[in-house]
């Protein structure tokens, strides 16, 4: 007796998951934001930050309606990385030395790509599973949502502030930051607050890249030792 074939899941249904639709909205918001990033900085800031906030919304919606999907997770991470990369490229055209922002871009992409690939090699279901990490800061980042949120928000807000306070092309980054911090204003307080969270995030990115590289090397060693 022939076995009945299981019905194939509809691809379209996954594309139309509510959290994935939120993801498409994020992409659209970012497209509009970057289209006006030089002509209307305040509008860019509002659209970009709103898109960033939707990052938390799509995750909550996915869990609330049981619509967690691999496609959604990939869409979420790609949107995050691309939007941050675009903003860093813009800042590299405004401030000098531009290498600062290009280095941050390289670190962000390299650390997250290595982390995702090492997660695949280790057979883990999520790149946020770092319970076996020897770094307490790395475990704290992925284990404490409040701390993670603070670090991520600090990075994005800092980059937005730098875009808003730039008056001319080819600004000196250090001079602008020091001048803003010495003004003793709500903006200087916010800048200082975000600088600390930003520094934590970059430290974690370095740890993440090194930890992921270790996993890849360990995988190669174990592969060579197999008969």
From Swiss-Prot:
Pfam families: CDP-OH_P_transf. Keywords: Lipid biosynthesis, Lipid metabolism, Magnesium, Manganese, Membrane, Metal-binding, Phospholipid biosynthesis, Phospholipid metabolism, Transferase, Transmembrane, Transmembrane helix. Its EC number is 2.7.8.11. Mg(2+) 1 binds at residues 55, 58, 76. PROSITE patterns: CDP_ALCOHOL_P_TRANSF. It comes from the Eukaryota. Catalyzes the biosynthesis of phosphatidylinositol (PtdIns) as well as PtdIns:inositol exchange reaction. May thus act to reduce an excessive cellular PtdIns content. The exchange activity is due to the reverse reaction of PtdIns synthase and is dependent on CMP, which is tightly bound to the enzyme. Belongs to the CDP-alcohol phosphatidyltransferase class-I family. This is CDP-diacylglycerol--inositol 3-phosphatidyltransferase 1.
């Amino acid at each position: 007796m022939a076995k009945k074939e299981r019905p194939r899941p509809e691809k379209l249904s996954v594309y139309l998951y509510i959290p994935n639709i939120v993801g498409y909205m994020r992409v659209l918001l970012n497209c509009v934001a970057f289209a006006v990033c030089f002509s209307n900085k305040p509008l860019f800031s509002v659209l970009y930050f709103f898109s960033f906030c939707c990052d938390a919304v799509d995750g909550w919606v996915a869990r609330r309606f049981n619509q967690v999907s691999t496609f959604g997770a990939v869409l979420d991470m790609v949107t995050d990385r691309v939007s941050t990369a675009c903003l860093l490229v813009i800042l590299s055209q405004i401030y000098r030395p531009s290498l600062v922002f290009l280095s941050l871009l390289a670190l962000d992409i390299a650390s997250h790509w290595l982390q995702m690939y090492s997660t695949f090699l280790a057979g883990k279901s999520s790149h946020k599973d770092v319970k076996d990490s020897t770094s307490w800061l790395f475990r704290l980042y992925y284990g404490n949502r409040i701390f993670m949120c603070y670090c991520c928000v600090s990075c994005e807000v800092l980059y937005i502030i730098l875009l808003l306070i730039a008056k001319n092309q080819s600004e000196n980054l250090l001079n602008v930051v020091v001048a803003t911090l010495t003004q003793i204003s709500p903006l200087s307080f916010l800048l200082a607050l975000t600088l600390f969270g930003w520094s934590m995030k970059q430290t974690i990115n370095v740890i993440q890249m090194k930890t992921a590289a270790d996993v890849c090397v360990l995988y190669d060693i174990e592969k060579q030792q197999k008969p």
